[in-house]
Amino acid sequence: MKIIARNKKALFDYSIIERFEAGIVLKGSEVVALRAGRANLKDSFVRIIKNEIFLLNSHISLLHTTHSFYKHEERGARKLLMHRKQIDKLLGKVSIEGYTIVALDLYFNTKNKVKATLALAKGKNLHDKRETLKKKQADLEAKAAMKNYK
């Protein structure tokens, strides 16, 4: 499993409830760009539109070798492939309980297919974010202290 892009900001801004794997519909030029590692999920989000699930605002850069006929839209909507039951479950959670769906990473699986890891998440408050930062800082200090005693 080769990870192409990771959304680090999502782990800071949201508390993850459940993770899902989804296939993604891409053009050939997009796959070539992903193999070169030219993807960014920083501002991306997932929406369910007419019982289909889409990854929006994800950035896949163009390669300089791509012919103008085959160029793709860099920030276009990309359809995600999931089972109907999974989509219905996500739709119920998002519409009723106030959760959101976040893209965590893009990767190539063992069969060289591009997959996306999605997460059902709930937004963190400012207090929760500060607590996360404090915990991270404490872990770093503990590691540094352990390193000195070796």
Swiss-Prot record:
CDD domains: SmpB. One of its GO terms (molecular function) is RNA binding. GO terms for biological process: trans-translation. It is found in: Cytoplasm. Keywords: Cytoplasm, RNA-binding. SUPFAM superfamilies: Small protein B (SmpB). GO terms for cellular component: cytosol. It comes from the Bacteria. The keyword 4Fe-4S does not apply. Transmembrane segments: none annotated. It holds the Pfam family SmpB. Required for rescue of stalled ribosomes mediated by trans-translation. Binds to transfer-messenger RNA (tmRNA), required for stable association of tmRNA with ribosomes. tmRNA and SmpB together mimic tRNA shape, replacing the anticodon stem-loop with SmpB. tmRNA is encoded by the ssrA gene; the 2 termini fold to resemble tRNA(Ala) and it encodes a 'tag peptide', a short internal open reading frame. During trans-translation Ala-aminoacylated tmRNA acts like a tRNA, entering the A-site of stalled ribosomes, displacing the stalled mRNA. Belongs to the SmpB family. NCBIfam families: PRK05422.1, smpB. This is SsrA-binding protein. The lineage of its organism: Bacteria, Pseudomonadati, Campylobacterota, Epsilonproteobacteria, Campylobacterales.
